[in-house]
């Protein structure tokens, strides 16, 4: 807002106001003849935040005549002063009402468009914070529940893999045992065949022994029959060999020989069977120990593979959990950074608004001080005017009074309405013409 005072004719006051769309201006000029000598005072204009402009009263020069005494009718002069004071007080009251109206409008605007309103530039989401916290808690619990379910699925999958590996290992072990059993069956078949061969040989030898015994008995019977015949041969020879004894001896020799052969065959069979049995026992023990060792090694390998798979699965699960945790932390960090940025922006806006309110408060304090100073000056002028009137009343004589020529004071107040871009929308001129006994008020509208 700019305030300009210019003089035209006797004294003209003009006030130019610029605001968001409303302007208020008031000016007053008063010229009181006969008080002081060339004394003048001017009450300047001021600006209020929110589009309020006040142009204070411009009190014109109180001029006195060359004798320094009041001339004319003192009652009319005091009445003019009272009228001007009443007009000034009315202007002050009107400005106070306008100021209160603008303050109410500003308050309504802040309530409607300020922070905390639904249409404001800075929304207040404080009522949504409990809902957001509840939803965040539900999301965290659901995330933890999902992580627990995923962990249980991983554990179940690992358990299934372990059981599958155990089944495969047991199946391989079963197949290996079946193969060993089949091998042992082949060995058993070979041993059975060998035993059968030995039994056949034993039967053959037994049959041969029986056949030899039978032949021996037949020969013995034949010899006995031949010896027991009715042939009587008498010879005068030397006594011969006793055939019975000879046959008995031969039978004894053959029996001893057969027994010896049987013993030798049995000893040979026992020897061969013992070595074979020992070899079979050694081979069976070595096979059993090797099979046991192989089984232990397979079990150890299976256990190590299961542990390796479980460790790999645990590593994968921990890596997934770490990745998910890092992602969650990154998301939370980004949200916190966004909240920090929003809070910093809000803090900057609050500081800016605080600075603006501080400046407005300082301007209002300056306006208040200026108005108080103007009121004090006006009161001091009124007090001086009353003293001058009393002095003039005591010293005045009918012969020394001079007739004062009528004087005219013209006050022009220019009120302009501007848009936010500074363009003049409309302009009005208030003209106040005052005489010693008559006041004419005119209003002229100037098109923009």
Curated annotation (Swiss-Prot):
Region feature (Linker 12): 224-246
Domain of life: Eukaryota
Basic and acidic residues bias (residue ranges): 430-448
One cellular component term from this protein's GO annotations in UniProt: intermediate filament
Family label: Belongs to the intermediate filament family.
Function description: Essential for the proper assembly of type I and type II keratin protein complexes and formation of keratin intermediate filaments in the inner root sheath (irs).
Protein name per the record: Keratin, type I cytoskeletal 27
UniProt organism field: Mus musculus
